[in-house]
Amino acid sequence: MTIFRPHLRFLFKPHFLYFQSPIGKSSRPFSTSQILRTALDMPPPPVDTTQRLAKLRELMAQNKVDVYSMQFRYTIKAPLIITVVYSFFFFLLLALKLCLRKTAISQSTLLHVTGVETLIRITAAFISSFTGSAGCAIVSMSKAALSTDGRYFSQAAKQLDANWTLLKRGVEGVPTWEEWTAEQAENGKVVGVDPSLITAGENLQYSPLTSVIVVNCSYVIADARKLSQTLKTTGGSLIGIDQNLIDAVWGDERPARPANQITVQPVERAGKSFEEKVEDLRKELAAKKRSAMVISTLDEIAWLFNLRGSDIPYNPVFFSYAIVTPSVAELYVDESKLSPEARKHLEGKVILKPYDSIFQASKVLAESKASASSGSSGKFLLSNKASWSLSLALGGEQNVVEVRSPITDAKAIKNEVELEGFRKCHIRDGAALIEYFAWLENALIKEGAQLDEVDGADKLFEIRKKYDLFVGNSFDTISSTGANGATIHYKPEKSTCAVIDPEAMYLCDSGGQYLDGTTDTTRTLHFGEPTEFQKKAYALVLKGHISIDNAIFPKGTTGYAIDSFARQHLWKEGLDYLHGTGHGVGSFLYAEVPLSANNVLSNEPGYYEDGNFGIRLENLVICKEVQTAHKFGDKPFLGFESITLVPFCQKLLDASLLTEAERKWVNDYHARVWEKTSPFFEKDELTTAWLKRETQPI
């Protein structure tokens, strides 16, 4: 899966999670199954949004709002791999209301950081008809604009109707969504935001019109400060309001909160007991002299307590909050969702509290502050991704220290049990993909079958289900033929998808959730005769992939230093791609956090020709310490171990375009693919023949 992150991103198939077992989350009552059905029932894009915008503008007028903005950043394609987590789902649902002054915007991100991507997609699609995973929709009384990044330029152009202006993020001369919003809010207009959907920042006031913060949210945008500063340049200002206009639009039709069962991730797969993890967190609190940590990020809670849920499609998390002090651990969750095993798992070690009581509990915590015997400063630790409303409940900045969550860093470093689980599940998943590609080629070429993109995705799911420890997909399968492959986060729908063309490129980006790990693999194939340019583009992408796989770098290196390894060959030809080269914990390319041994990341360069084809080649890799002849500065050096086991397409491989070293890399890789996966097909002649052909030396 790919992700665009101009300032933070290699992982972000969100702060991205690499959960080791699958299963989800939210604060307001939303049923993911209902949301998913709604998404599937939506009419094919583009949708005429005239009436929807008119209704929204009526509500804006009633609430004395001139501008309404919704920011959403989540990754449709992001498998939650708690094991490598860095969950960066900005979910949308936002809201606002202002009064006394005319004004503006509701910026939204997500509740609980991890996982309401379906909800966001529905909300964003409802208003704009755009179904991409990242962007910002802004509506004034006379204009509507949608800002998104390069992954979605093509998709947005197709899905937005005439009511909307597309703001291409990162393109010279095009305003950012903050700048565009500031233009709409000039001359003293006030921009309102839901405090549960933004992080606390400077220059923000809380509206005295409401005294109770009702909405719960844990992963919020960190742009409140930036937005406030931008608004000041045009005379606008930013305040927090408690009302959510989207809730008002939904009314009684708002889906109920998920009530899916919560299960235990056994220590045999987690590699570490939750008691040890909680104790490690307490040591961190003691080192920082803090009284407690309030946790709202769903993947962090699931990882910390070795629990898994299924409240969010493809993501093993559940709606919850947690508070950890030097002596007590509290989990705020709907107790009816806990399996008997989960209850026993927590019994006597974790105090269970009602999910909806977190804000009151935070206020009580703030009032009591820290006990004198704790030796702490009395301040509470809060993730810098937590909501402004949660910070306020804890007493604001005088009681709260907002930092990068220590749990995020702990999750990013996999233990040996987790790493071995990743390796094993990739062997099985590689076999499933090999079986699928062999079946697909045979069906298209030998049998002349008419198969569409959804047929392909469904067949892959059927095949994966046969393999041990499979739980479900880790994200929506991107099964795309021809021009659809150029839409980076393409999602085929039965009513609008294309028939797979054997004479066109076929891009398949998919992943599975297994009890012992999560997979994410992309391969691009051709079942006919590719053009010379297609083979050259494929070679350039493969060269970049190999360059990353072979990279050796000193500990402390960030993704910025490595990104050019993947792009250098494309750059020499004047080509590039508009997404991050990878994702994983701690992030990789486009990440500010240095890479560390035992991070799990993706390596996925690509190339996309709009209206024609797309190429992406993705393996997951483990960052590990490597032996070098010297150690400059007595610093260890790191490299990568590729764990994905699926061959590259022989029809697209032109050996003459690769160096001798690159050809050796391909041959060695294919030999390993054959060794690890061929035993699965001893009684499957068709797949064995396909695999033997695709792994032959070049």
UniProtKB/Swiss-Prot annotation:
It comes from the Eukaryota. Its EC number is 3.4.11.9. GO terms for biological process: proteolysis. SUPFAM superfamilies: Creatinase/aminopeptidase, Creatinase/prolidase N-terminal domain. CDD domains: APP. One of its GO terms (cellular component) is cytoplasm. GO terms for molecular function: metal ion binding; metalloaminopeptidase activity. Mn(2+) 1 binds at D520, E604, E618. Keywords: Aminopeptidase, Hydrolase, Manganese, Metal-binding, Metalloprotease, Protease. InterPro entries: Creatin/AminoP/Spt16_N, Creatinase/aminopeptidase-like, Creatinase_N, Pept_M24, Pept_M24B, Peptidase_M24_C, X-Pro_aminopeptidase_P. Pfam families: Creatinase_N (PF01321), Creatinase_N_2 (PF16189), Peptidase_M24 (PF00557), Peptidase_M24_C (PF16188). Mn(2+) 2 binds at D509, D520, E618. This is Probable Xaa-Pro aminopeptidase P. It comes from Arthroderma benhamiae (strain ATCC MYA-4681 / CBS 112371). Binds 2 manganese ions per subunit. It catalyses: Release of any N-terminal amino acid, including proline, that is linked to proline, even from a dipeptide or tripeptide. Catalyzes the removal of a penultimate prolyl residue from the N-termini of peptides. Its cofactor is Mn(2+).
